UniProtKB/Swiss-Prot annotation:
Protein name as catalogued: Diacetyl reductase [(S)-acetoin forming]
Organism: Staphylococcus aureus (strain Mu50 / ATCC 700699)
InterPro entries according to UniProt: 23BDH, NAD(P)-bd_dom_sf, Sc_DH/Rdtase_CS, SDR_fam
Keyword tags: NAD, Oxidoreductase
Keyword Mitochondrion recorded: no
Catalysed transformations (reactions): (S)-acetoin + NAD(+) = diacetyl + NADH + H(+)
Residue numbers binding substrate: S141
Gene name for this UniProt entry: butA
Length: 258
């Protein structure tokens, strides 16, 4: 299946990002897998498209504005158009409030917030160039809907992403551009595993205890899989979501009711 549309996914080498890229290829998109881990991005793109016709890999540090603009421009040049930007890349360190350093602050905000802002700007540039609307999809989190203990930096960045999403949706609506966000809950990914382990270590407890601090709140009784999230991104990237903008879809199995 092909829909002749082009998408870019940041943080696409593994976890949720890879599953999003995989689903978009299944939906007929040509996809750029963008990641700081160049080898990981190449492996992901090769898995998605052995001949490079449906997926390409691009190395980028999303906290660097030039990197993001260059990645989007390269994607548009390679595939001849640009339609969907998925700002998925993120960092999720455990940061008790008194332990946060200036370096940590700059690093996490650089990736989680600046990376989204640069992605919005870079996508907008291409939508204007090709003289059509488009879709921008940002990764926030259930931790961007309600603060989680011990995650000061992560939570505050994800709240910021929701704000950026709402403002950009209003600023760009007249150009036929929708801007929405998805808010995963506890997803079985390497990043979530590191958070669960760190939470347990902080408390001097086993890893299983760390997971329990998060999973006990899930109404549907199971940890989310990356596919649960990629299904929602597929909807936001497709025509069925054309009349939705400025919204955050919570994909957490019933952790937060807002």
């Amino acid at each position: 299946m092909t829909n002749n549309k082009v998408a870019l996914v940041t943080g696409g080498a593994q976890g949720i990002g890879f599953k999003i890229a995989e689903r978009l290829v299944e939906d007929g998109f040509k996809v750029a897998v963008v990641d700081f881990n160049e080898e990981g991005a190449k492996a992901a793109a090769l898995k998605l498209s052995s001949d490079g016709t449906k997926a390409i890999a691009i190395k980028a540090d999303v906290s660097n504005r030039d990197d993001v603009f260059n990645a989007v421009r390269q994607t548009a040049a390679q595939f001849g158009d640009f339609h969907v930007m998925v700002n998925n890349a993120g960092l999720g360190p455990t940061t008790p409030i008194d332990t946060i350093t200036e370096e940590q602050f700059k690093t996490v905000y650089g990736v989680n917030v600046a990376g989204v802002l640069w992605g919005i700007q870079a996508a907008h540039e291409q939508f204007k160039k090709f003289n059509h609307g488009g879709k921008i999809i940002n990764a926030t989190s259930q931790a961007g809907v309600e603060g989680n203990p011990g995650l000061s930096l992560y939570c505050s960045t994800k709240f910021a992403v929701r704000g950026l999403t709402q403002v950009a949706a209003q600023d760009l609506a007249s150009e036929g551009i929708t801007v929405n966000a998805f808010a995963p809950g506890i997803v079985q990914t390497p990043m979530m595993e590191s958070i669960a382990v760190a939470t347990a270590e902080e408390a001097g407890k086993p890893e299983a205890w760390g997971w329990e601090q998060f999973t006990s709140q899930i109404a549907l009784g199971r940890v989310s899989q990356p596919e649960d999230v990629s299904n929602v991104v597929s909807f936001l990237a497709g025509k069925d979501s054309d009349y939705i903008t400025g919204q955050t879809i919570i994909v957490d199995g019933g952790m937060r009711f807002r």
